[in-house]
Amino acid sequence: MYKLKIDAWPINEVPTPKVCMSDSIFKRKARKHQSDFRWRVLHCGHNPNHRIGQYGSYLLWEDAVLGKNFYTPYWPKIKHAIENRYPNSKQYELTPIYANMLRSEHIPFNFFVPMMDDFDAAAKVFDELIEENAIAKIIDIKIEYAPEKQYALNDGTSFDTFVLYQHIDGSIGGIGIEIKYTEAGYQLKRGSKEEKDILQGKTSNILTSLVAVTTIKTVCHPY
């Protein structure tokens, strides 16, 4: 856990980043929170001349490549997971996930890479989340997994994280997780195709043999 080292950092000299006028009230608070965290806890500066960095919630690249946007005790494993997921990506393509503290792309790696070390403990966590004593074991956890088109969901989308597990009755289940931070969340509109698919019990081709599919939509607040 990070600890605020007040005596070791000049908190009275916090640079004041520019205010992004297009931010919502929540996003403005989240941006300030992350900017303060960057300075007071991570001890990292920002680039006042950068198009995004001027607002304070964007890491300098030299800090970003050290994993400052991630859970640092697991940074080597998280870095390995990111490189495996995006093996052919250029630096500019990975910059948002490494440097942007307001996006949600880095959050699944922070949450679920540590879980991959202990599937037994992970099974207990997910059992509690779905409020059932149903998970015998976790089989796999896939972050930002995009299956082939024929195996995608009916609306062509996929999940930020997919957890494959064995039910206590021996059948196979899946938990789909969509994570949001400052991005707008998904609203299930009455009468929409998504609502009808859920009510009619439709699933994608890859999930037709699965006994249970639970979608967990998590909003990660900054406080």
Give the role of each language-model region:
Residues 146-150, 168, 180-184:
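Short, solvent-exposed loop/turn segments at secondary-structure junctions
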Residues 1-151:
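Nuclease-adjacent, charged terminal/linker segments that flank catalytic cores
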Residues 164-176:
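Active-site beta-strand-loop-beta-strand hairpin of nuclease catalytic cores
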Residues 116-120, 166, 181, 185:
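Hydrophobic/aromatic-lined pockets within catalytic cores
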Residues 156-166:
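Short acidic loop-to-beta-strand element that houses the catalytic metal-binding Asp/Glu
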Residues 125-129, 178-180, 189-196:
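"Short basic amphipathic alpha-helical interaction patches in structured regions
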Residues 102, 106, 110, 153-157, ...:
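Short, well-structured alpha-helical interface segments that form or flank functional binding sites
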Residues 185-223:
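Acidic, metal/cofactor-coordinating or nucleic-acid-engaging core segments within structured domains
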